[in-house]
Amino acid sequence: MAAPDLSTNLQEEATCAICLDYFTDPVMTDCGHNFCRECIRRCWGQPEGPYACPECRELSAQRNLRPNRPLAKMAEMARRLHPPSPVPQGVCAAHREPLTTFCGDDLSLLCPICERSEHWTHRVRPLQEAADDLKGRLEKSLEHLRKQMEDAMLFQAQAEETCALWQKMVESQRQNVLGEFERLRRLLAEEEQQLLQKLEEEELEVLPRLREGAARLGQQSTQLAALISELESRCQLPALGLLQDIKDALCRVQDVKLQPPAVVPMELRTVCRVPGLVETLRRFRGDITLDPDTANPELVLSEDRRSVQRGEQRQALPDNPERFDPGPCVLGQERITSGRHYWEVEVGDQTSWALGVCKETANRKEKGELSAGNGFWILVFLGSFYNSNEPAFSPLRDPPKRVGIFLDYEAGHLSFYSATDGSLLFIFPETLFSGTLRPLFSPLSSSPTPMTICRLIGVSGDTLGPQ
């Protein structure tokens, strides 16, 4: 047999009788014929048998299909030796027959073989009839799509207009922010200059009087020292020398009258008050309550754990490690390890109190100095403000009724304010905080009104007082 005949026979043996193309995943029926798995599946489209072989029409009760792997290899060899030729337009790719009809169910072009095989139960129409019908449907779809396109273009124009408007609004607000903060900077700079000028005027007004008093005292000290030295020397003289001109010496002693300096008020009239500062700090407000397990037995806490005052007698409470004793202190429940925090405390007319923060690990059982070295950063009021690290400074004309405490953990900043008028009371030197900090409260004296943690609401600075 010639080589071309062998090649032709290989093509014929590797070709499916249904699709007339090389086998794809060939399977064998009970009668021994081979077909592509997908071709025979579509040919046997009905769910129940009997099933007829497309070649010999032999009936089979079940779909017994066995994979034919050798035939699959043969089909692959034939496909490599003789690749399928391109299918001309208008010709069925499966059967190489002219496309003459259109399947309305699968929306596909059919040749006569397709129509008689897997599409024999479908709605099949001539090409021109199907084309005319689909053309009408396409024209309706085009009309709908054109309307959709008009709407899309309108929406696009509106979206672009909205984007431009949004950018304009953002830019306007940006300019408002820049302008407002520039105004605030000018206002703060002017306020700073006014306060510094007032301080300088106070300094120039009071300091000469203080220096005059100090100079006068210096002169008196010099005169007293000279007189003392003279009398000490006279006491060492013999009787004649001691008594000689003694009248003059005694007269000068009797004439000595120490003139104390004039009393100069040590109250600064100028206070550091930044406009709007308290309102800004209230943005960092926290909801702080008292921890009863840390309260000294002499302290009485309210039911809502927001108020504390000295009791009339010591309570019988467990001596747990967290409790302050003997110090009259109580801590807040909140544990601070980062961030900015602000709270306000109503102290009313109490004559002495202490507020601030302390380390979680600070000693609460020994009576010692509540200093930063021991883990305490507190402001104490005893008629004047002071803390354990700084010398006492002069009393205010009007001690605050409400105290604001601001803590910036990362910045190492702790400051105290009069929450009533926003004036600065005290700022601790910059501190490197570490570990957990807790708010500290201490009513140092008995008072009919308690020390109360205020409820702060709203960002604008609106507050609810002690509840």
Swiss-Prot record:
What GO terms in the biological process aspect are recorded for it?
host-mediated suppression of symbiont invasion; innate immune response; negative regulation of AIM2 inflammasome complex assembly; negative regulation of DNA-templated transcription; negative regulation of neurogenesis; negative regulation of viral transcription; positive regulation of viral entry into host cell; protein autoubiquitination
Broad class of where this protein is predominantly found: cytoplasm
Give the UniProt tissue specificity note. Expressed in embryonic central nervous system (CNS), kidney, thymus and gut.
GO molecular function (one): protein domain specific binding
Annotated compartments: Cytoplasm; Nucleus
Induction entry: By PAX6.
- Cite the residue ranges of zinc fingers (B box-type): 87-127
Q: Which InterPro entries match?
A: B30.2/SPRY (IPR001870), B30.2/SPRY_sf (IPR043136), Butyrophylin_SPRY (IPR003879), ConA-like_dom_sf (IPR013320), PRY (IPR006574), SPRY_dom (IPR003877), TRIM/RBCC (IPR050143), Znf_B-box (IPR000315)
> Any coiled-coil ranges, and where?
128-207
Tell me which residue ranges form RING-type zinc fingers. 16-57
Q: Where is the signal peptide?
A: none
The UniProt entry, under CDD domains, shows: RING-HC_TRIM7-like_C-IV
Domain-related comment: The coiled-coil domain and the B30.2 domain are both necessary for interaction with HN and PAX6. They are also involved in MED15-binding. The B30.2 domain may be involved cellular protein quality control by promoting the degradation of insoluble ubiquitinated proteins.
Its quaternary organisation is: Binds cytoplasmic tail of integrin alpha-1. Interacts with the HN peptide. Interacts with PHOX2B. Interacts (when autoubiquitinated) with SQSTM1/p62; promoting AIM2 recruitment to autophagosomes. Interacts with AIM2; promoting its autophagy-dependent degradation.
Protein's name in the database: E3 ubiquitin-protein ligase TRIM11
Organism this protein belongs to: Mus musculus
- Provide the organism lineage as a comma list: Eukaryota, Metazoa, Chordata, Craniata, Vertebrata
